[in-house]
Structures are given as structure tokens and as C-alpha cells.
Amino acid sequence: MNILNKLGIGSSRQTNMDPSPIAQVIDDEAPAPGNQFTQFGAGCFWSVELAYQRVPGVTQTEVGYSQGITHDPSYKDVCSGTTNHAEIVRVQYDPKECSYQSLLDLFWSKHDPTTLNRQGNDVGTQYRSGIYFYNPEQEKLARESLERHQQQVDRKVVTEILPAKKFYRAEEHHQQYLSKGGRFGLKQSTEKGCNDPIRCYG
């Protein structure tokens, strides 16, 4: 994924790299009526977003940056490792159609939460594992879920569980990247319930 950084894509934003209190506030954007938000960080946000797009009851996904110190970062800023942002997928879901627990189960299945600041060949703090909650019930379920998952693996789970902070939507070409075809125009299905393997490519 860092190839975009090398090509200079996503670098049009002019970011003030000084720490900003704006970046530290709780995400107060409102989901659609009857829906809830949650945020997940599990490595490259392209493949994580596609996984959640396929979940019945998920009504919207967006990729972006959160948990950092600067206001309105660009992809290039985040890749520099100096802003402390994580690559995030913000998931909007209808709790009548999709349980939060099912979203957590998918989270654990789609990445290795025992590798610190790394998923596969993607290395950096922006690729860290994280669950970012919007209410006490989400926090409770997330922590219980982590405890259960820890019992299933030999190495220490390094996933952080924190309140969801301000969400900075990523540049448009990152949104639904794999379903739009990615770099090579190879579109991948977003059909609800689809189990096709997800191929993440720049």
C-alpha cells in the first residue's frame, strides 16, 4: 500500500503537523437514524473495509484516520509515522440486523492482533490493531471479546481498545478501493454474505 506514498498520491492536503486538540476529541458525528458507529484498525484499511462491506446489516463504511495528534492529516502524513494516526474503517451498522459481537468476530478473523504495528508486509504505527468504541456497551463487549481471543492464541494480543476519537475521512480514491477495482481495475464483490477471498493490492 505504501506505493501510493511513493507515487505522491494522497499528498494534496496541506497539514499543520503541530499537535492539535481537535484531533483528540471524541467522534461526535451522528450515524443514520437507528444505526450505530464503530471503528476498527486492522492493518491496511482497503481490505478491512471490503470485509465489512460484505456484512449484512452494515449500512455504510468509510476509511480514514483517527487516534492521532494532528488535525486533518493526509495519507502521506499518516505514512510518515509522525502523526500517530491509525488507518481506520468506520462502520455504520443497524443493530437490529447486525450484532456488534459479529463485527468483533470478523475483526479478529481478518488480521493478526499479536503483531505490534504490523500486518504482513505493512509496517508502521498506522497499521496497529485497534477497536475504538462509541458507548459503554461496545467497550464492554470489546474487552470481553479480547479476553476470549487471548485464550485462543499463544502470543500476547496487542490490540488497543479506546474511545473513538475524531474521524478524518481519507482521500476519495481510498474509499471502497478494492470494490472499485484498485490499481489494476480488478473489482471485488461487495455482495452481502460474499465469502470470496479478499485480495489486497496497490
Curated annotation (Swiss-Prot):
UniProt-listed Pfam families: PMSR
Source species, domain of life: Eukaryota
EC number: 1.8.4.11
Family: Belongs to the MsrA Met sulfoxide reductase family.
Role: Catalyzes the reduction of methionine sulfoxide (MetSO) to methionine in proteins. Plays a protective role against oxidative stress by restoring activity to proteins that have been inactivated by methionine oxidation. MSRA family specifically reduces the MetSO S-enantiomer.
Name of this chain's protein: Peptide methionine sulfoxide reductase A1
UniProt-recorded Gene Ontology molecular function terms: L-methionine:thioredoxin-disulfide S-oxidoreductase activity; peptide-methionine (S)-S-oxide reductase activity
Residue positions, PTM Phosphoserine: S189
Catalytic activity as recorded in UniProt: L-methionyl-[protein] + [thioredoxin]-disulfide + H2O = L-methionyl-(S)-S-oxide-[protein] + [thioredoxin]-dithiol; [thioredoxin]-disulfide + L-methionine + H2O = L-methionine (S)-S-oxide + [thioredoxin]-dithiol
